[in-house]
């Protein structure tokens, strides 16, 4: 701790003022500022959250392509950081002699894309936010509607959200046979095709069942 504190005090404070400098308070204040940047949710992240909700639409097969976006970003960012470490190592090798007390490496903005280190931080922040948002959405939908609903019609959706593979017993799935045309429910006329993938409450018995498919006789 003393070895980490002394260079900061020597570089930023006048000689003789070390006793009046509260290093712990300085570190706490710095961490609070960094915490706001790393954990804070910007309007851009909320915009991507809305796009995630809109992509969860029937027919878009989001479970096939959406999980690969954070994965590709993490692989690209990790590769870039590894390249930066390699470049810094080569720069030390090219320097030859090392002067005692001088910084061994000299990182700069030119090592990052477009000279913007914050772009890498934003991409990491984006992946963390998207993973947390998808997991929160999965937990909320299970809590509100249960595991066997139209939100989790595909097993891939559950695997994408939480890594859990449900054991769905098809023999226990309740089915219903509807006559061709319209289904009258509580003074509402609905096309039977619109009921696929929905949880329906029977008007005569009050029982709830999941409409997996429709068969016309």
Curated annotation (Swiss-Prot):
Function: May be involved in modulation of pathogen defense and leaf cell death.
Entry membrane topology: Multi-pass membrane protein
Annotated keywords: Membrane, Pathogenesis-related protein, Plant defense, Transmembrane, Transmembrane helix
GO biological process: defense response
UniProt lineage: Eukaryota, Viridiplantae, Streptophyta, Embryophyta, Tracheophyta
Name of the protein this chain belongs to: MLO-like protein
InterPro entries, per the entry: Mlo
Subcellular location, record wording: Membrane
Superkingdom of this protein's organism: Eukaryota
A cellular component annotation (GO) from this entry: membrane
Family classification: Belongs to the MLO family.
UniProt KW Transmembrane keyword: yes
Parts of the chain that traverse the membrane: 35-55, 59-79, 119-139
Record-linked Pfam families: Mlo
Record carries keyword Transmembrane: yes
